[in-house]
Amino acid sequence: MSLSSLLFYFVIIVPSAIIHEYAHGWMAERLGDPTARYAGRLTLDPRSHIDLWGTIVMPLFLFVVSGGSFMFAYAKPVPYNPYNLKNQKWGPAAVAVAGPLSNFLLAACFAALIRLMPVFPPSIWQLAPLFSIIVFANLLLMIFNLVPIPPLDGSKILFAILPDSMYKLRATLQQYLSLIHI
């Protein structure tokens, strides 16, 4: 992968990650928690979501170490207070689902544009490969975030589904799997 390819993927992944994080804050606010707004994070402004390590340093490091074959980036997680949510059991799951759902919707919109390409003038058709990469990147982000390992969104969905009697298991999984993530 060349430096231009790195920048190309970076320009696709970072906005998708920002929209993903914004969706978490948006859903939390809809469910009664204004924390993201108070923290200045209920915005699509990239400056509010860029994490020095996860958005800049780590992707560049991985790109260099892998010889240009691998890159991974993430945006700062949007804060929310689950105790402010109207529904304490399902609220955190709804906030968690909002991020991957935003990636799915982005992928669906760009897939629809690809499908509609024949309607547009041939000069527009050259955007199809770009749109395909956007679809692929967003589906990849969605699937990755649905993995049920803390702190990923899938774990919050799983924890909402687990019965309350499994609270100790949930707490243990959160504690130890979050350490593995770090």
Tell what function each PLM region has.
Residues 1-180:
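Hydrophobic transmembrane alpha-helices and their immediate loop junctions
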